[in-house]
Amino acid sequence: KHNVDLKLELAWTIVPFILIVWLTYYSWGPINEVWASPDDPDSMYGLECGTEGHDPNKCYHTIGITAQQWFWSFDCNGLDADICDSSEYQDLNGTMVPVLKLKQGEYFYANLSSEDVTHAPWFVKFGVKEDAVPGLHSALWIAPTCETANCGGDEGESTLLLCTEYCGDDHAYMAAIVNVHNN
């Protein structure tokens, strides 16, 4: 049988191909920043704050996030409490969960670890998620932002940190509160 729809078939092949190439090119920049090396001074995050040669307007802080069934724990690595604080707990639907307080406008490099099974911390409002696998080093860049101009006033703005990888019976209750403030 003779193929009379060659132009249509070529269009069905070429147009999606061009679209995929364009989307790949367009998204390469943001993906590259998500996995930027903490040792790259040319990345948007700069060098670690407090290291020699860092730019105070372009630097990041290192924090630790540990997952275990069915709880999050945070380590602010001795940072000032106005930049990072993890000493409080709050009631969330009848469950006491940890509160991570972060300062707006700062960058955080979070070293992720898991003590038991695979977990996946998801910072809901920040749009970032990464797997925490036992025995495997993984990290996540966090740039806390506020949706309102005054960042929630004295209380700050809160968002949730949820686990998106099924990790057992109480997976649905594995949450933390992330509070972003600008004072």
Which residues fall in each region the model found?
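Non-transmembrane, membrane-proximal soluble domains of secreted or membrane proteins
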Residues: 1-183
